[in-house]
Amino acid sequence: MIKKEDRKFKRIKRHLRIRKKVFGTSERPRLSVFRSEKHIYAQIIDDTKGHTLVSASTLDPDLRARIAKTYNKEAAKEVGKLVAQKALSKGISQVVFDRGGFKFHGRIRELADAAREAGLKF
């Protein structure tokens, strides 16, 4: 049986491997996703400056009022829409997607698809 610490360590190793290749610039910042057991977080980061330009999560007060649960696909879809709306309002239309070492399915995929539908290109 794989312990929880082993899974977390393997995910961190995958994320470091991905981060060697995925780099956000001012023209195409990085859309970074983190998934915990209860929440999902998305940030758009300019790696050249080291600044977070836009962020959204299931902890946002306006999003909490609209969703019943914070750990399902519907919540991830709402976070994807919200981060895309915030990015487009700041003039960001193209990003590089960083899945954070997680598999591209389930909540991660729903967030990415919702962000694409809302107007982000990646």
From Swiss-Prot:
It comes from the Bacteria. CDD domains: Ribosomal_L18_L5e. InterPro entries: Ribosomal_uL18_bac-type, Ribosomal_uL18_bac/euk. GO terms for molecular function: 5S rRNA binding; structural constituent of ribosome. The keyword Zinc does not apply. GO terms for cellular component: cytosolic large ribosomal subunit. Keywords: Ribonucleoprotein, Ribosomal protein, RNA-binding, rRNA-binding. Pfam families: Ribosomal_L18p (PF00861). One of its GO terms (biological process) is translation. Part of the 50S ribosomal subunit; part of the 5S rRNA/L5/L18/L25 subcomplex. Contacts the 5S and 23S rRNAs. This is one of the proteins that bind and probably mediate the attachment of the 5S RNA into the large ribosomal subunit, where it forms part of the central protuberance. Belongs to the universal ribosomal protein uL18 family. This is Large ribosomal subunit protein uL18.
